[in-house]
From Swiss-Prot:
One of its GO terms (biological process) is protein refolding. This is DnaJ homolog 1, mitochondrial. Its main location: mitochondrion. It comes from the Eukaryota. PANTHER family: DNAJ HOMOLOG 1, MITOCHONDRIAL-RELATED.
Amino acid sequence: MNPSSALMPKATAIPGCILRTSRQCSKHNQTSGIRASSSTRQYHVAAIESPARRRRDSTFMKRSDFIQARNFHATKVLAAIPDPYKVLGVDKGASAGDIKKAYYGMAKKYHPDTNKDPGAKEKFAEAQSAYELLSDKKKRETYDRFGSAAFDQNGGFDPSAGAGGNPFAGGGGFHGFGGGFGGGFPGGFAADINIEDLFGAFAGGARRSGRGRRGPFQEILVGEDIEVQTNISFMEAAKGTSQDIVITPLKECGTCKGDGLKEGAKRTQCRQCNGTGTRVHLMQGGFQVAATCDACGGAGLIVPRGSHCGTCKGDGVVRERKTVRVDIPGGVEDGMRLRISGEGDAPPTGTAAAPGTRTQRGDLYVSIRVSPDERFSRSGSDILYTASIPLTTALLGGEVLVPTLDGQVKVKVATGTGTGDRITLSGMGMKKLGGRSRGFSPNGDLKVEFKVAMPKYLTSNQRTILEVLADEMGDKTARRIMDIPRDGLSTAPAADASSGNESKSEGFLKSAWHKLMNHKKPAGSENSSDSSSNKDSNSSGDSKKSE
């Protein structure tokens, strides 16, 4: 054990975070012999730095002889779309045919199914994107004018905005925040605000230019809609028709031209709100609430007393009687509404804030009521018709006349048709709204449902025939009340079963039929029998005389 180690403090008594050791080795020249080198271990205690000082020191984490520098850089710039002309290898003045030819060549060369090169798929995708851009006339014109920035989805640039327009409308704009401010905040803060409309209002309207200062918002007065109802027949709904509808909409006053003022009169500033359009109310607790001025309606201007137009009473609009011809297309259903744009009421411009306020008439809505038809019923574009057929036609088959939208047609009835059986006549139904679909008929179908008419009362002849039919069909459950001789149907001797039964049954059916139809024997047969009897009597008398 080294004697000096007893004088050393224990390492555990000093915190490890501030304990540093150093080892010094010394060599002595060998004079009289070899002397072992002695090693000395020294402990150095570093002063503890305060946390505040370490925070102020920018290098307290790691002390070194060099200064550590940290560089700040902007976010990586998004790569712009490649030049489509260079991708396809054509000039900017190339025709559509040259562009198409170049694209087909690249597509054939770099198609992933034929070219297994790892980079072929990427080149094929670039060629597709380039051709899609250059094949569209508008997209190509936009690219030639603005470059790749016009198609940057993250740039928010709209090349069609123009001067005074909304450059943030393209590429999504502010719509990424949940459809305006309302989508980004719980509770629906201003959920109905459209940021593009808001920007357009502050910009003074998109695509509008002009000198002079404009207001921050452009007011548009929209008139009320008019709703009317008209009745049409089932056939008119199927074929389409036109109707004249009388309405009484509001129109611009011809006397004041919509100003609501007399000739030479002007609006004056509202004294209640001093032209601001709002009035501030002081509430309890020092709160202030701003509300729309009830005197001017928020316009800030009022019409002086006695300056109103005598025709429209200051509203700027008057009612007129008008006839509108409405074209009702074929295929409309009961309860549908047709909208005729711009045929509603004109807005009351006499109450507008400024004489030059933009206006827009309302719309006319026509509700269609279709009267029911006695013969047909409807299911969408299909027509349903119930055809009543006799019992004999249902059993034996035949043809019946079925009415359609274009007249009557003959329909074959299969043998054994029962109640509820249907047949479909394709393309003979209602017209389908929305245009003709490819591969499908523009009209619906006519579905005919058969109903067998069962007789409630039978004559004696009809019942006799049916009872005979029941006997022929072996129906033992049918009720029989007619007195029909059935001796021919009785069992015959076994020896005569083959031929005798047939002749007897045939004779029975004939006799039953003659009895049913009240057939009498022919007159010739009776005369012949009488003459034969007379001859027999005469011959017998002659024989007696001879005796």
